[in-house]
């Protein structure tokens, strides 16, 4: 079990991973890669996981995280000063950034080399996004009520 000091609302994932890695290494267990996945993705695709692990084992990156490419117009800022970050729309013509926005889904799967965890720098050095294209795979369910909503939606829309 991790100590109470690492169970507060402002505890970072980097702190928890560093503690866990130190505990494992103190027991003589050493790993080339650490995988982190939250339980909120019930439709996580095993082929995506396999592909991400293979990409990590190719040795090009220190960190690989799952991501979603948002193709719709994405805004940033306050309501008085909004700026387009990326995306496409037939209504809004952009003059700046033509790129789409990547949303981190590190809870879907985050693969990190232990050297990055020791430095508590999960997203520095050589970081790579693995873009997931399956919208069902990235569906996150955070609560019982969200789960019930999804199940009820599927019951209404799926016929046998």
PLM-predicted stretches and their roles:
Residues 32, 60-63, 153-154:
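Solvent-exposed, well-ordered amphipathic alpha-helical segments
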Residues 21, 53, 151-154:
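A generic alpha-helix structural signal
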Residues 1-35, 43-51:
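Short phosphate-binding loop-to-helix
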Residues 25-26, 57, 155:
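Residue-level signal for alpha-helix termini/capping positions
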Residues 17-20, 117, 150:
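Buried hydrophobic packing segments
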Residues 130-160:
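Hydrophobic helical membrane-anchoring modules
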Residues 26-30, 61, 159:
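Secondary-structure boundary/capping residues
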Residues 11-15, 39-136:
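Conserved core of the sugar-phosphate nucleotidyltransferase
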């Amino acid at each position: 079990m991790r100590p109470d000091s690492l169970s507060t609302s402002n505890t970072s994932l980097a702190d928890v991973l560093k503690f866990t890695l130190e505990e494992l290494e103190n027991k003589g267990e050493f790993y080339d890669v650490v995988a982190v996945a939250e339980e909120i993705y019930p439709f996580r695709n095993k082929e995506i996981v396999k592909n991400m692990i293979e990409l990590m084992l190719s040795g090009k990156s220190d960190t690989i995280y799952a991501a979603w490419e948002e193709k719709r117009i994405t805004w940033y800022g306050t309501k008085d000063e909004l700026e387009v970050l990326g995306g496409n729309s037939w209504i809004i013509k952009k003059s700046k950034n033509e790129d789409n926005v990547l949303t981190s889904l590190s809870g879907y799967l985050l693969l990190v080399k232990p050297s990055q965890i020791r430095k508590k720098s999960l997203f520095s050095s050589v970081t790579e996004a693995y873009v997931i294209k399956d919208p069902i795979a990235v569906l996150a369910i955070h609560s019982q009520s969200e789960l019930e909503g999804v199940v009820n939606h599927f019951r209404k829309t799926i016929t046998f």
